[in-house]
Amino acid sequence: MNVKIDGRRKINSNVIVPPDKSISHRSIMIGSLANGVTEIENFLFSDDCLATINCFKNLSTDIEIRNDKIIVKGNGFALSAPKQILDCQNSGTTTRLLLGILSTQEFESILTGDSSLKKRPMKRVTVPLSQMGAEFEFLEKEDFLPIKVKGSKKLKPIEYTLPIPSAQVKSALIFASLKAEGKSVIKESPKSRDHTELMLKHAGANIKSWEKDGVYTVEILPSQISSIKIKIPSDISSAAFFIVLALICEGSSVVIENCILNPTRTGIIDVLKQMGAEIKIEDVENRNGELVGKIVARSSNLRGVKVEKNDIPRIIDEIPILAVAAAFAEGKTIIDHASELRVKESDRIKTTVEMLKSFGAECYELENGLEIIGSREKLKSAVVNSYKDHRIAMAASIMACAVEGESTILDADCVSISFPNFYDILFSSTKKI
């Protein structure tokens, strides 16, 4: 599906963005491994999260969608061997966290995915899990899906420092460590998003975490986990698109309520504020360890910045839309130390640069990042290849709203990966200037 957007639009709305994708995935996983019945409200019914549900159903977890809730009947890590291959579709989170969970199970499983997921490296997860005693076989190409997994009931505890901060790798090791024969210690620097730790602590797992001298440490002891009740807040990664839309469009403002404000996720707010963005955070409350609140953003004159290395893990999913903001800013923006972007749904360094250039922006690809020379006057409408990457498609759509003329976003239906009603909200909440 291609989408046409007539530019020079503005927004003055309260926008309801989808539930948080990271927490939606983890709620199904924790519910499946818990003892008892987990109730989940405000779940994200996107392609990625549905892949997680289907995989756990294939592992014999009883998951029921009941009105606006999901009911998960957990069996305390007593999963059953799947009768078919576990298809993770396009979801890296499903795949990598499942590798950790399946490492605790004695049966064999095979995981696969779509053509995009098959290009994403998996040894970063399988190497430390192998050290714990799980067995992996790459069935087609070394380091890539499909993978055969054989777990163990006698996993060895691990002390492991992540070479590159990654919430997915860290989470896989945490899940496996819950069933290891002793204390495991996982370290990373800087800290990546910590939803797994917070949610497992809420479910009664024996987990401690702390930061010292720039190093984040998680200590895990073998644990049973209890069922939870959770209402999932809105996803700040999805909110970021409408925040930037308000910042770069003349006479615009947006209000987003019930949004996740976990400090490991608010890097996009911090960097935009450094660029001069008028953004306010209001009505903050703590829900089971997660901060939730209201975000208000208004049209702003932005300036270029150099993004700090320690901020990269906190903005890794938002870099395409941050780059759009940078194209409208005055001066140079440098985003570096972001090699992880090379192995996302697309090579997001390359595809973000190509997307910006399509609109006439001056930008350059760096080895591990990008450099953008902002100039609103140079920007024009465009036909943009999304590369079937949901975050590229949405970032391009926001840019199309702010430039003059009609733009076309190719393969725009990929937004269903994380934000199925993105275009409904975009067109209903904006109007021509």
Curated annotation (Swiss-Prot):
Q: Which UniProt keywords apply?
A: Amino-acid biosynthesis, Aromatic amino acid biosynthesis, Cytoplasm, Transferase
Catalysed reaction equations from the record = 3-phosphoshikimate + phosphoenolpyruvate = 5-O-(1-carboxyvinyl)-3-phosphoshikimate + phosphate
Q: Record's GO cellular component, any one?
A: cytoplasm
Q: What is its EC number?
A: 2.5.1.19
What quaternary arrangement does the UniProt entry report? Monomer.
Family, per entry:
Belongs to the EPSP synthase family.
HAMAP family in the cross-refs: EPSP_synth
What is the role of the protein in this entry? Catalyzes the transfer of the enolpyruvyl moiety of phosphoenolpyruvate (PEP) to the 5-hydroxyl of shikimate-3-phosphate (S3P) to produce enolpyruvyl shikimate-3-phosphate and inorganic phosphate.
**What is the name of the protein in this document?**
3-phosphoshikimate 1-carboxyvinyltransferase
Underlying gene: aroA
